[in-house]
Amino acid sequence: MAEQAKLPDQAQPVPETQVPDNGKPEQQPTATESAPAPEPATTEPTTAATAPSAVDGTGETAPAAPEPAAAPVAAAAAAPAPEPTKSEPQPAVGEQSEPAKKDEPAKPEYFTKTPALEQFFDRLPTILSNTGHQEMWGVPLKHEVTDIPTINVLIKFLRANAGDLKAAEDQLSKALTWRKENDPIALADASKNSYDASKFKGLGYLTTYQREGKGDLVVTWNIYGAVKKFDETFGDITEFIKWRAALMELAVQELKLDQATSVIDYDGEDPYQMIQVHDYLNVSFLRMNPNVKAATKKTIDVFSTAYPELLREKFFVNVPAIMGWMFAVMKVFVNQNTARKFHPISNGANLAKEFPAGVAEKFPKAYGGSAPDLESSARTVALKEVKEEKKEEPKEGSKEEQKGEQKGE
C-alpha cells in the first residue's frame, strides 16, 4: 500500500521534469521503480495543494499523470490516482464561477436602496413598447442601468406615487401617451408654433436665476391680472392648455434633465424642480368665471399627470386673505404632497423674502427685488398678432326693396 501511495507523489513533478524527455515514461517497468519518493506522508498535502491550482487553471495536469505509464502494472498501481480526480475538477470549475460572479458589475446603489425603482426600470421596455413613445421632458428614455437621466425620470414618477409601482407605471404610460399626442416640445418651438397675443400677451413668463453652489433657480410666472377678456383667453380650453404647456416646456428645458450627471436621492432633495408664481392682482374673486374654472381644472388634470415632481413650491400672490377657500378647492384636485407646496401671500412685494438674499434681489421690483419688470426682463412663448376678421353686416335696404324680396320668395 505504501508503494501505491508513492505513485501519485511522484506524479506531481512529472509535467515539469519528464515532459521534455519523451522516452522516460516507457522505461518505468513497475510502480516501485518509478516512485523514488520515500515518504508516503506527503501524499495528502500534495493532493490538497493541487485543488487550488485547478482553480487557477494549472492543476488540471495532476489527474493526467498516470497516463504516461505504459505498463499495465503501473496502471494498476495507479488505482488510487482517481482520488485526486474525485477531488473533482467539476467542483473546482464551480468554484471558479464564484470569482467570475464577483467580477460582474455590482448592482447600483439606487436599485439596492429602492427595490421598487429596479422593478420600475425592468418594466420600462414594456411601457415604451405599449405607448409607442420614448421621450419624456427632453430625455430619451433608455433601458440602460447607467443612463442617469432615465433613472431620474423614473424616480420622479415613483416618488409622485409614494412608491406605488403600479400607479407609477400607469402614470408614466399616460404621460408618454399625452406627449405623443400633443408634442409639447413642438408647442414651445417658436419656429413651429406661436400664440394669439390678444389672448396671452403678458399672461406668462419665465425667469432663470443663477445661484452660487447650486443649480439655477427656474421660475414661471402666471399673471392673471393681465387677462383682458377671460372668455377669450380661457374660452378655448384646448388652445389655453397648448399655450400653458408651451410655457411649461420652456421651463423644463431650463432644468436640463437630459444633462443630469447624478442620480436624485429618492429620499432627499430633488435639484430638478422649479418655482411657480401665480399673481392675482386686480382679479376679482367674488364671482369666478366658469371658463376660468373649467380651464383651471383641466390644467391641473393634465399637469399633475404629465409633469409630476417638477414643482418645488407654488406661490399665490396678491390673494386676499379671505380667499382661503380657493386653495381648499385646489387641494381637492392634487395629491397631499403637492398641496403642501402651496403658499398664499396677500402682498406680492413680500415674495422675495421667501428666498435667499442672493436670489431675492434678482426678482422684479413688484415682488420685492430690484430687477426690472417681467415684460422687459423675462422670457415668454412666441406670440403673434392675429387680425380679427370683420364680419360684414347686412346692408339695410329700403322697406320697399325688402317687401319686394319677400314677394319674390
Swiss-Prot record:
It catalyses: a 1,2-diacyl-sn-glycero-3-phospho-(1D-myo-inositol)(in) = a 1,2-diacyl-sn-glycero-3-phospho-(1D-myo-inositol)(out). PROSITE patterns: CRAL_TRIO. One of its GO terms (cellular component) is cytosol. Disulfide bonds: none annotated. Its main location: cytoplasm. Residues 29-54, 62-80 have a biased composition (Low complexity). The keyword Iron applies. It holds the Pfam family CRAL_TRIO. Keywords: Cytoplasm, Endoplasmic reticulum, Heme, Iron, Lipid transport, Membrane, Metal-binding, Microsome, Transport. GO terms for biological process: Golgi to plasma membrane protein transport; regulation of exocytosis. Gene3D superfamilies: CRAL-TRIO lipid binding domain (3.40.525.10). PANTHER family: PHOSPHATIDYLINOSITOL TRANSFER PROTEIN SFH5. Belongs to the SFH5 family. This is Phosphatidylinositol transfer protein sfh5.
